[in-house]
Design a protein with these regions (language model features):
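Flanking helices and flexible, charged tails adjoining ferredoxin-like Fe-S electron-transfer domains
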Residues: 162-269
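Fe-S ferredoxin-like electron-transfer domains
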Residues: 31-176, 182, 189-204, 208
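Alpha-helix N-cap/helix-initiation motif
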Residues: 19-23, 130, 170-173, 230
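N-terminal cofactor/phosphate-binding cores enriched in small/glycine residues
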Residues: 2-53
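Conserved small/polar residues in nucleotide/adenosyl-binding loops
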Residues: 271-278
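Short polybasic/polar patches that bind polyanions
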Residues: 9, 99, 242
Length: 282
């Protein structure tokens, strides 16, 4: 059946969510999507509550809005609020909701969870001092990537998202695909940034610096500068990289072409060598 959230979105009514990811994470944990249903006590979680015939739903009543503000206050009370230096500043779902509901301060102050930052993996940094326990990363790892490298561990105040045994991502079956980063609504997960190291190398006159770009980059960069989606900016990209100080710019396609030719040649040679062994009698 259709949920209240789905029905509302179909008719253009905006109900805020934090933990919801369609078909991936529909658990109602964050409670931001609460609504009032006439004739029922308390609030209903719209992302999991099914629509029923004759149901009268209030999505933006005074009581609902006040309850959502309290929920935001509680989430922020255990959140590391260093928004100015956070990589998600301006692109954070929690921050956007705080602005939308005019939550400028935190009424519920108290003890906070303190977690070590895990930056041992080659590409992902985990800072669960910013985690809101929405479990979107857990669901996308299990259901989309079919890996299940992370899960919710411990209970109550000690609950956190981590690996089994609370090991680093570097020590479990994580493939470093980055899907968890894409799913995270806040700054708890981010790509490892090597920008400063690159600048240091570019400033060193004794270092010969090269850059290798993936094929997708040449058609993704243009969007950041207001160009139509899919615009090929290879020339502009190479010129910009050279002006930054890179001595050579290589395209990953070159290596891919070599690999295709080499593996294709090996396959043809193998087929010819084993041709006399092929049996097709039926």
């Amino acid at each position: 059946g259709t949920t209240i959230l789905q029905a509302a979105r179909q008719v253009g009514i905006d109900i805020p969510t934090l933990c919801f990811l369609k078909d991936i994470n529909e658990i109602g944990d964050c409670r931001m999507c609460i609504v009032q249903v006439d004739g029922r006590r308390g609030f209903a979680t719209s992302c999991i509550q099914k629509v029923e015939e004759g149901m009268n739903v209030r999505t933006h009543s005074k009581e609902v809005i006040e309850a959502r503000k309290v929920i935001l206050d509680l989430i922020l009370s255990n959140h590391q609020r260093d928004c100015l230096t956070c990589t998600r500043n301006g692109n954070c779902e929690l921050q956007n909701l705080a602005v939308k509901f005019n939550v400028t301060g935190v009424e519920y102050e108290g003890e906070k969870n303190k977690h070590k930052i895990d930056d041992l993996s080659p590409s992902i940094v985990r800072d669960f001092n910013k985690c809101i326990l929405c479990r979107r990363c857990v669901s996308v790892c299990k259901k989309v990537q079919k890996i299940g490298a992370i899960d919710c561990i411990n209970r109550g105040f000690e609950s956190c998202i981590s690996t089994i045994g609370d090991h680093s991502l570097n020590d479990v079956n994580c493939t470093f695909c980055g899907q968890c980063i894409e799913a995270c609504p806040v700054g708890a997960l981010k790509e490892k940034d090597s920008t400063q190291e690159a600048w240091e190398k570019l400033k060193d006159p004794e270092t010969y610096v090269i850059v290798q770009t993936a094929p997708a980059v040449r058609v993704a960069l243009g969007e950041e500068f207001g160009m139509p989606i899919g615009t090929n900016v290879t020339g502009k990209m190479v010129s910009a990289l050279k002006r930054l100080g890179f001595d050579k710019v290589f395209d990953t396609n070159t290596g891919a072409d070599f690999t295709i030719m080499e593996e294709g040649t090996e396959s043809v040679s193998y087929t010819h060598l084993r041709a006399h062994e092929t049996v097709l009698d039926l």
